[in-house]
Curated annotation (Swiss-Prot):
It is found in: Plastid, Chloroplast. Participates in various redox reactions through the reversible oxidation of the active center dithiol to a disulfide. The F form is known to activate a number of enzymes of the photosynthetic carbon cycle. This is Thioredoxin F-type, chloroplastic. Residues 52-177 form the Thioredoxin domain. The keyword Transport applies.
Length: 182
């Protein structure tokens, strides 16, 4: 018989874990139930670790909620990028890969925000290419910042390097027209 657990945060049930878990992750103690084994399950952005300890079981749960709003630019990281891209389905996704210290990145940021308000059928994301996100930046093949990647169906279909606003608009228009005709 499958075990179904409903975890509700309460001050007595949750305490921060130590040793490598982010602040969003909590440790919850629940009574021991038969059928609970040491296992990890990943469901979307939620990761559950079941560990049997004595007469109780420990469930470590990480649940991150990422809201992608129309007309907004959503900040992503190495953990949230691909789930959001997959959730976008057939929508066009535009990713701004930037750094905090990049002058051209700062100049184009307000224009990028304006594009997110103009193209409400497109998902606009931004990724800070800091050391923590370096694996994703490397996976996406970044060489310079800013770099804009345009994705459709989980695949990069266009790339614009540098703060070239007109080139970015043209790439978005091309991807949108290819999307509507194909």
């Amino acid at each position: 018989m499958p075990l179904s657990l409903r975890l509700a945060p309460s001050p007595t049930a949750l305490s921060p874990t130590t040793g490598g878990f982010s602040p969003a992750k909590k440790q919850c103690r629940i009574p021991s139930y038969s059928g609970v084994a040491t296992t990890t399950r990943r469901i979307g952005l939620c990761s559950l670790d079941y560990v049997k300890r004595g007469d109780s079981s420990v469930v470590r749960c990480s649940l991150q909620t990422v809201n992608v709003s129309v007309g907004q630019v959503t900040e992503v990281d190495k953990d949230t990028f691909w789930p959001i891209v997959k959730a976008a389905g057939e929508k066009i996704v535009v990713l701004d890969m930037y750094t905090q210290w990049c002058g051209p990145c700062k100049v184009i940021a307000p224009k990028y925000k304006a594009l997110s308000e103009k193209y409400e059928d497109v998902v606009f994301l931004k990724l800070d290419c800091n050391p923590e996100n370096r694996p994703l930046a490397k996976e996406l093949g970044i060489r310079v910042v800013p770099t804009f990647k345009i994705l459709k169906d989980n695949q990069v279909v266009k790339e614009v390097t540098g703060a070239k606003y007109d080139d970015l608009v043209a790439a978005i228009e091309t991807a949108r027209s290819a999307s509507s005709s194909g």
